[in-house]
Amino acid sequence: MDFISIEQLVSGERVDRKALEFGRGVPDPGGWPSGWTLGPQEAVAREKLKLEEEKRKKLERFNSSRLTLDNLTDLENLVQRRRKKRQRHKVPPREPESGAEPQPQVPLEPVGLEMFLKAAAENQEALIDKYLADGGDPNAHDKLHRTALHWACLKGHRQLVNKLLAAGAAIEVRDLLDRTPVFWACRGGHLDILKRLLNQGAQVNAQDKIWSTPLHVAVRMGHSDCLEHLIECGAHINAQDKEGDTALHEAVRYGHHKATKLLLLYGAKLGVKNVASQTPVQLARDWQRGIRDALQAHVGHPRTRC
Protein backbone atom coordinates (compact mmCIF):
# COMPACT_ATOMS: atom_id res chain seq x y z
CA MET A 1 0.00 0.00 0.00
CA ASP A 2 1.35 3.43 -0.97
CA PHE A 3 1.37 6.33 1.41
CA ILE A 4 1.04 9.96 0.24
CA SER A 5 2.21 12.83 2.32
CA ILE A 6 0.22 15.96 2.99
CA GLU A 7 2.77 18.05 1.02
CA GLN A 8 2.28 15.87 -2.03
CA LEU A 9 -1.46 16.21 -1.84
CA VAL A 10 -1.24 20.00 -1.53
CA SER A 11 1.41 20.55 -4.21
CA GLY A 12 -0.02 18.00 -6.60
CA GLU A 13 3.40 16.60 -7.41
CA ARG A 14 2.11 13.07 -7.74
CA VAL A 15 -0.51 12.88 -10.37
CA ASP A 16 -2.13 10.07 -12.12
CA ARG A 17 0.54 9.22 -14.70
CA LYS A 18 -1.57 6.33 -15.79
CA ALA A 19 -4.23 8.76 -16.96
CA LEU A 20 -1.94 11.50 -18.27
CA GLU A 21 0.91 9.62 -19.95
CA PHE A 22 0.34 5.91 -20.42
CA GLY A 23 -3.37 5.57 -20.87
CA ARG A 24 -3.07 1.82 -21.50
CA GLY A 25 -4.09 0.34 -18.17
CA VAL A 26 -0.51 -0.44 -17.05
CA PRO A 27 -0.09 0.29 -13.34
CA ASP A 28 2.31 3.12 -12.68
CA PRO A 29 4.62 2.49 -9.75
CA GLY A 30 4.32 5.31 -7.32
CA GLY A 31 1.02 6.50 -8.89
CA TRP A 32 -2.30 6.82 -7.29
CA PRO A 33 -3.54 3.72 -5.48
CA SER A 34 -6.26 1.75 -7.17
CA GLY A 35 -9.68 3.05 -6.36
CA TRP A 36 -8.28 6.41 -5.29
CA THR A 37 -10.49 9.39 -6.24
CA LEU A 38 -8.85 12.67 -7.39
CA GLY A 39 -9.55 15.67 -5.24
CA PRO A 40 -9.82 19.37 -6.29
CA GLN A 41 -6.09 20.06 -5.91
CA GLU A 42 -5.14 17.06 -7.99
CA ALA A 43 -7.60 18.05 -10.72
CA VAL A 44 -6.11 21.54 -10.89
CA ALA A 45 -2.60 20.14 -11.14
CA ARG A 46 -3.71 17.82 -13.88
CA GLU A 47 -5.19 20.68 -15.92
CA LYS A 48 -1.99 22.69 -15.49
CA LEU A 49 0.04 19.87 -16.95
CA LYS A 50 -2.31 19.63 -19.90
CA LEU A 51 -2.04 23.37 -20.66
CA GLU A 52 1.75 23.32 -20.39
CA GLU A 53 1.93 20.33 -22.71
CA GLU A 54 -0.28 22.07 -25.30
CA LYS A 55 1.84 25.25 -25.14
CA ARG A 56 4.99 23.20 -25.61
CA LYS A 57 3.57 21.45 -28.67
CA LYS A 58 2.42 24.76 -30.23
CA LEU A 59 5.86 26.25 -29.69
CA GLU A 60 7.47 23.26 -31.37
CA ARG A 61 5.14 23.55 -34.35
CA PHE A 62 5.85 27.28 -34.65
CA ASN A 63 9.61 26.78 -34.51
CA SER A 64 9.45 24.03 -37.09
CA SER A 65 7.45 26.26 -39.47
CA ARG A 66 9.87 29.20 -39.33
CA LEU A 67 12.32 29.79 -42.16
CA THR A 68 15.82 31.00 -41.51
CA LEU A 69 17.12 33.55 -44.00
CA ASP A 70 20.80 32.74 -43.70
CA ASN A 71 21.45 32.92 -47.44
CA LEU A 72 19.86 33.73 -50.79
CA THR A 73 18.46 30.22 -51.17
CA ASP A 74 16.42 30.62 -47.99
CA LEU A 75 14.99 33.89 -49.32
CA GLU A 76 14.02 32.27 -52.62
CA ASN A 77 12.32 29.44 -50.73
CA LEU A 78 10.34 31.96 -48.72
CA VAL A 79 9.23 33.80 -51.86
CA GLN A 80 8.18 30.56 -53.55
CA ARG A 81 6.26 29.49 -50.47
CA ARG A 82 4.37 32.79 -50.27
CA ARG A 83 3.62 32.67 -53.98
CA LYS A 84 2.16 29.17 -53.74
CA LYS A 85 0.07 30.25 -50.77
CA ARG A 86 -1.37 33.20 -52.72
CA GLN A 87 -2.17 30.96 -55.66
CA ARG A 88 -4.04 28.55 -53.41
CA HIS A 89 -6.18 31.37 -52.03
CA LYS A 90 -6.58 33.23 -55.30
CA VAL A 91 -10.21 33.65 -56.34
CA PRO A 92 -10.73 32.66 -59.97
CA PRO A 93 -12.25 35.38 -62.18
CA ARG A 94 -15.99 35.23 -62.53
CA GLU A 95 -17.34 34.25 -65.86
CA PRO A 96 -19.76 36.72 -67.45
CA GLU A 97 -23.27 35.94 -66.40
CA SER A 98 -25.88 35.18 -68.94
CA GLY A 99 -28.01 37.98 -67.50
CA ALA A 100 -25.49 40.73 -68.40
CA GLU A 101 -26.58 43.85 -70.24
CA PRO A 102 -27.59 42.92 -73.78
CA GLN A 103 -25.64 44.61 -76.52
CA PRO A 104 -27.73 46.80 -78.81
CA GLN A 105 -28.82 44.73 -81.74
CA VAL A 106 -28.96 46.06 -85.23
CA PRO A 107 -32.61 46.23 -86.30
CA LEU A 108 -33.54 44.00 -89.19
CA GLU A 109 -36.15 46.38 -90.54
CA PRO A 110 -35.12 49.48 -92.51
CA VAL A 111 -34.74 52.69 -90.50
CA GLY A 112 -36.96 55.50 -91.73
CA LEU A 113 -36.23 59.22 -91.73
CA GLU A 114 -38.21 59.96 -88.58
CA MET A 115 -36.51 57.15 -86.67
CA PHE A 116 -33.13 58.28 -88.01
CA LEU A 117 -33.56 61.85 -86.73
CA LYS A 118 -34.89 60.62 -83.39
CA ALA A 119 -31.92 58.28 -83.06
CA ALA A 120 -29.57 61.23 -83.65
CA ALA A 121 -31.23 63.18 -80.83
CA GLU A 122 -31.12 60.16 -78.48
CA ASN A 123 -27.63 58.98 -79.48
CA GLN A 124 -28.74 55.54 -80.69
CA GLU A 125 -25.75 54.70 -82.82
CA ALA A 126 -27.02 51.26 -83.82
CA LEU A 127 -29.96 52.83 -85.64
CA ILE A 128 -27.67 55.42 -87.22
CA ASP A 129 -25.32 52.69 -88.45
CA LYS A 130 -28.22 50.71 -89.89
CA TYR A 131 -29.60 53.76 -91.69
CA LEU A 132 -26.23 54.66 -93.19
CA ALA A 133 -25.41 51.04 -94.06
CA ASP A 134 -28.65 50.82 -96.06
CA GLY A 135 -27.57 53.83 -98.10
CA GLY A 136 -29.53 56.50 -96.25
CA ASP A 137 -28.76 60.16 -96.90
CA PRO A 138 -26.93 61.70 -93.89
CA ASN A 139 -28.27 65.13 -94.94
CA ALA A 140 -31.92 64.08 -94.90
CA HIS A 141 -34.10 66.53 -92.96
CA ASP A 142 -37.61 67.02 -91.63
CA LYS A 143 -40.09 69.71 -92.67
CA LEU A 144 -38.15 72.29 -90.62
CA HIS A 145 -34.94 71.32 -92.44
CA ARG A 146 -33.39 69.92 -89.26
CA THR A 147 -30.83 67.22 -89.97
CA ALA A 148 -29.28 64.53 -87.80
CA LEU A 149 -26.16 66.69 -87.48
CA HIS A 150 -28.26 69.55 -86.08
CA TRP A 151 -29.69 67.27 -83.38
CA ALA A 152 -26.37 65.65 -82.52
CA CYS A 153 -24.75 69.09 -82.08
CA LEU A 154 -27.60 70.34 -79.90
CA LYS A 155 -27.57 67.28 -77.64
CA GLY A 156 -23.79 67.04 -77.35
CA HIS A 157 -23.23 63.61 -78.96
CA ARG A 158 -19.63 64.11 -80.05
CA GLN A 159 -18.97 60.58 -81.36
CA LEU A 160 -22.15 60.73 -83.39
CA VAL A 161 -21.10 64.10 -84.82
CA ASN A 162 -17.82 62.57 -85.96
CA LYS A 163 -19.63 59.61 -87.49
CA LEU A 164 -22.07 61.81 -89.41
CA LEU A 165 -19.29 64.05 -90.70
CA ALA A 166 -17.34 60.99 -91.81
CA ALA A 167 -20.45 59.74 -93.62
CA GLY A 168 -20.69 62.98 -95.60
CA ALA A 169 -22.99 65.20 -93.53
CA ALA A 170 -22.79 68.81 -94.75
CA ILE A 171 -21.17 71.03 -92.15
CA GLU A 172 -22.94 74.19 -93.41
CA VAL A 173 -26.39 72.64 -93.75
CA ARG A 174 -29.10 75.13 -92.70
CA ASP A 175 -32.46 74.64 -91.05
CA LEU A 176 -35.59 76.64 -91.83
CA LEU A 177 -34.16 79.65 -89.93
CA ASP A 178 -30.85 79.38 -91.82
CA ARG A 179 -29.03 78.17 -88.73
CA THR A 180 -26.05 75.90 -89.26
CA PRO A 181 -24.88 73.17 -86.84
CA VAL A 182 -22.55 75.77 -85.27
CA PHE A 183 -25.64 77.67 -84.07
CA TRP A 184 -27.04 74.48 -82.56
CA ALA A 185 -23.77 73.63 -80.81
CA CYS A 186 -23.70 77.14 -79.29
CA ARG A 187 -27.32 76.79 -78.27
CA GLY A 188 -26.54 73.54 -76.45
CA GLY A 189 -23.33 74.93 -74.96
CA HIS A 190 -21.12 72.07 -76.18
CA LEU A 191 -17.66 73.57 -76.55
CA ASP A 192 -16.01 70.35 -77.71
CA ILE A 193 -18.41 69.99 -80.63
CA LEU A 194 -18.09 73.69 -81.47
CA LYS A 195 -14.32 73.25 -81.70
CA ARG A 196 -14.77 70.18 -83.90
CA LEU A 197 -17.01 72.05 -86.34
CA LEU A 198 -14.78 75.12 -86.53
CA ASN A 199 -11.69 72.96 -87.03
CA GLN A 200 -13.55 71.23 -89.85
CA GLY A 201 -14.03 74.60 -91.57
CA ALA A 202 -17.44 75.79 -90.38
CA GLN A 203 -18.09 79.54 -90.65
CA VAL A 204 -17.75 81.36 -87.36
CA ASN A 205 -19.65 84.46 -88.59
CA ALA A 206 -22.59 82.76 -90.27
CA GLN A 207 -25.92 84.64 -90.03
CA ASP A 208 -29.44 83.29 -89.77
CA LYS A 209 -32.63 84.88 -91.08
CA ILE A 210 -32.65 87.57 -88.40
CA TRP A 211 -28.92 88.24 -88.91
CA SER A 212 -27.95 86.70 -85.61
CA THR A 213 -24.52 85.10 -85.43
CA PRO A 214 -23.38 82.14 -83.32
CA LEU A 215 -21.95 84.76 -80.94
CA HIS A 216 -25.45 86.17 -80.36
CA VAL A 217 -26.77 82.68 -79.62
CA ALA A 218 -23.97 81.83 -77.20
CA VAL A 219 -24.57 85.09 -75.29
CA ARG A 220 -28.34 84.62 -75.13
CA MET A 221 -27.92 81.13 -73.69
CA GLY A 222 -25.23 82.26 -71.25
CA HIS A 223 -22.52 79.89 -72.53
CA SER A 224 -19.47 82.03 -71.82
CA ASP A 225 -16.97 79.32 -72.77
CA CYS A 226 -18.44 79.06 -76.27
CA LEU A 227 -18.56 82.87 -76.47
CA GLU A 228 -14.87 83.21 -75.66
CA HIS A 229 -13.85 80.51 -78.13
CA LEU A 230 -15.87 82.14 -80.91
CA ILE A 231 -14.10 85.45 -80.29
CA GLU A 232 -10.71 83.75 -80.31
CA CYS A 233 -11.62 82.13 -83.63
CA GLY A 234 -12.40 85.50 -85.24
CA ALA A 235 -16.06 86.17 -84.48
CA HIS A 236 -17.13 89.77 -85.13
CA ILE A 237 -17.69 91.01 -81.61
CA ASN A 238 -19.80 94.04 -82.66
CA ALA A 239 -21.92 92.27 -85.30
CA GLN A 240 -25.56 93.47 -85.28
CA ASP A 241 -28.74 91.53 -85.97
CA LYS A 242 -31.87 92.90 -87.66
CA GLU A 243 -32.80 94.76 -84.48
CA GLY A 244 -29.36 96.35 -84.40
CA ASP A 245 -28.42 94.50 -81.24
CA THR A 246 -24.85 93.41 -80.67
CA ALA A 247 -23.77 90.58 -78.43
CA LEU A 248 -23.24 93.18 -75.69
CA HIS A 249 -26.87 94.33 -76.03
CA GLU A 250 -27.97 90.72 -75.56
CA ALA A 251 -25.70 90.18 -72.57
CA VAL A 252 -27.15 93.25 -70.84
CA ARG A 253 -30.72 92.37 -71.75
CA TYR A 254 -30.46 88.81 -70.39
CA GLY A 255 -28.44 89.85 -67.35
CA HIS A 256 -25.44 87.63 -68.10
CA HIS A 257 -22.74 89.40 -66.07
CA LYS A 258 -19.89 87.05 -67.00
CA ALA A 259 -20.64 87.37 -70.71
CA THR A 260 -20.78 91.16 -70.33
CA LYS A 261 -17.37 91.25 -68.67
CA LEU A 262 -15.85 88.99 -71.33
CA LEU A 263 -17.21 91.10 -74.18
CA LEU A 264 -15.87 94.29 -72.61
CA LEU A 265 -12.54 92.60 -72.00
CA TYR A 266 -12.27 91.70 -75.69
CA GLY A 267 -13.16 95.25 -76.80
CA ALA A 268 -16.92 95.32 -77.41
CA LYS A 269 -18.07 98.88 -78.13
CA LEU A 270 -20.37 100.61 -75.67
CA GLY A 271 -21.68 103.25 -78.08
CA VAL A 272 -23.29 101.00 -80.73
CA LYS A 273 -27.00 101.86 -81.08
CA ASN A 274 -29.69 99.41 -82.08
CA VAL A 275 -32.85 100.14 -84.08
CA ALA A 276 -34.42 101.65 -80.97
CA SER A 277 -31.43 104.01 -80.69
CA GLN A 278 -30.29 102.37 -77.48
CA THR A 279 -26.72 101.64 -76.57
CA PRO A 280 -25.87 98.81 -74.18
CA VAL A 281 -25.36 101.40 -71.43
CA GLN A 282 -28.81 102.95 -72.02
CA LEU A 283 -30.32 99.49 -72.16
CA ALA A 284 -28.82 98.71 -68.77
CA ARG A 285 -30.23 101.95 -67.33
CA ASP A 286 -33.68 101.23 -68.75
CA TRP A 287 -33.51 97.68 -67.43
CA GLN A 288 -32.58 98.96 -63.97
CA ARG A 289 -35.28 101.62 -64.16
CA GLY A 290 -37.82 98.97 -65.07
CA ILE A 291 -36.81 96.89 -62.07
CA ARG A 292 -37.00 99.95 -59.81
CA ASP A 293 -40.46 100.89 -61.13
CA ALA A 294 -41.70 97.33 -60.62
CA LEU A 295 -40.48 97.35 -57.02
CA GLN A 296 -41.98 100.76 -56.27
CA ALA A 297 -45.31 99.73 -57.77
CA HIS A 298 -45.59 96.92 -55.24
CA VAL A 299 -44.58 98.92 -52.17
CA GLY A 300 -47.35 98.59 -49.60
CA HIS A 301 -49.18 95.90 -51.57
CA PRO A 302 -50.81 93.35 -49.21
CA ARG A 303 -49.28 90.41 -51.05
CA THR A 304 -45.71 91.70 -50.84
CA ARG A 305 -45.84 93.24 -47.38
CA CYS A 306 -43.63 91.48 -44.80
From Swiss-Prot:
Compositional bias segments (type: Basic residues): 80-91
Q: Where is this protein chiefly located?
A: nucleus
Disulfide connectivity for this sequence is none
Q: Which GO terms describe its molecular function?
A: titin binding
The question of whether Coiled coil is a record keyword is answered with yes
The alphabetical list of record keywords is:
ANK repeat, Coiled coil, Nucleus, Repeat
| Pfam families in UniProt | Ank, Ank_2
What GO terms in the biological process aspect are recorded for it?
Answer: fatty acid metabolic process; regulation of sarcomere organization; response to muscle stretch
* Cell location: Nucleus
> ANK repeats span which residues?
144-173, 177-206, 210-239, 243-272
List the coiled-coil residues. Answer: 41-90
- Note the superkingdom of the native organism: Eukaryota
Q: Name one GO cellular component term.
A: intercalated disc
Against InterPro entries, the record matches this protein to: Ankyrin-SOCS_Box, Ankyrin_rpt, Ankyrin_rpt-contain_sf
Q: Where is this region: Disordered?
A: 78-107
Q: Where is this region: Interaction with TTN?
A: 179-196
| Function statement | May be involved in the energy metabolism. Could be a molecular link between myofibrillar stretch-induced signaling pathways and muscle gene expression.
Please describe the quaternary structure of this protein.
Interacts with titin/TTN and MYPN.
Q: What is this protein called?
A: Ankyrin repeat domain-containing protein 23
Q: Which organism is it from?
A: Mus musculus (Mouse)
Gene name for this UniProt entry: Ankrd23
